[in-house]
Amino acid sequence: MKALQFGAGNIGRGFIGKTLSESGFSVIFSDVNQNIVDAINYNREYFVKIIGSNQNKTVNIKRVSAINSNDSNIKKIISSVDLITTAVGPTALEKIALIITQGIIFKIKNQFTKPLNIIACENKIKSSSFLKQVVLKNLPIKYHDYLNKYIGFIDCSIDTIIPSINNKDDLFLTVEEFKEWIVNINQFKGAVLKIVDMKFSNNLDAFIERKLFTLNTGHAIAAYLGLIKNYKTIQDAISDKKIRVIVRSAMEESGSVLIKRYNFNKNDHLDYIEKIFLRFENPFLSDKLERIGRNPLQKLRREDRLIKPFLGAFEYNLPYSNLAKGIAAAFYYHNKNDLESIELSSSIKKQGLESTIIKICDLPVNSKEVYSIILEYNLIKKIIR
């Protein structure tokens, strides 16, 4: 069995590539970073250190190779593999879709009918379904029947933390023991692939939003509040009592939305929040706040980790004040090394805060949602002082 993994970064190598290799796949990584591509092809293996609650261990990931995403030979690889996975970030999916489309056309023209399943592992709800729609837009209509018959786009939810830790070995990664990969079993074409620790669900939306509204929401709010106070790591931020209270309260507010929407058991969900806090506190997974908080425009979109649970609270008439504090912190934060942060700060300066919130978050003009964010923005220094 062969798999093509777009993205040879932390999640690509430390979670997806590792899991697929352990499941018996030969894994081909595709990335635009030629240095990473060369390193993988030179070593043909890499090492991953797993940090657990009781013990740590290092595993050797073998049967790996790599190709630059701009290499024209990638379409041949796409036509021959059993599985394609991605971990490139939601904003890069449209570029990946163009590459996948060319591979599918090559597969069709060579009359290959072996099913191909594609799993986009991104922090975007139903990212594989989104990827499918972009592929269909670029694929000639005469090939649509083939795609619907032989190409599966499987939506998923992934949950793990892989921090960026400097190491002499560019391929070496440190990962947490906890990992979760849940997929929609109904979207596979052909036989369902056997992948270690992969879980199947008929109610994937609930798991996707549980992870997005809890891990991602808490992570982002801790990062933006912590960065405003000049903290460096997630552990530093969570150790601050005021930040800790806001983050936990925000996760409980988003949790109330999940409980209302999906009928989750309240005590079970509070236990889930507690487990995530323990993961945040793990000193061996010291994650930098700049990494967690990067790309604020993406994180402030209507369907992402901050605004979606916030709007859910309004929808069900539930508390939202701590979610609003986290959103305000994202608008307040500025990083001169982050292009999206620069763009966000520039918009606030030129267009004003209210107009920027309405535009970036796609919120109604003169709405309670917008004014609640503005209120918290104006109080942000008092909140965390």
Curated annotation (Swiss-Prot):
Keywords: NAD, Oxidoreductase. InterPro entries: 6-PGluconate_DH-like_C_sf (IPR008927), 6PGD_dom2 (IPR013328), Mannitol_1_phos_5_DH (IPR023028), Mannitol_DH (IPR000669), Mannitol_DH_C (IPR013118), Mannitol_DH_N (IPR013131), NAD(P)-bd_dom_sf (IPR036291). NAD(+) binds at A3, L4, Q5, F6, G7, A8, G9, N10, I11, G12, R13, G14. GO terms for molecular function: mannitol-1-phosphate 5-dehydrogenase activity. One of its GO terms (cellular component) is cytosol. Its EC number is 1.1.1.17. It holds the Pfam family Mannitol_dh_C. It is an enzyme of class 1 (oxidoreductase). Signal peptide: none annotated. Belongs to the mannitol dehydrogenase family. This is Mannitol-1-phosphate 5-dehydrogenase. It comes from Buchnera aphidicola subsp. Acyrthosiphon pisum (strain 5A). The lineage of its organism: Bacteria, Pseudomonadati, Pseudomonadota, Gammaproteobacteria, Enterobacterales.
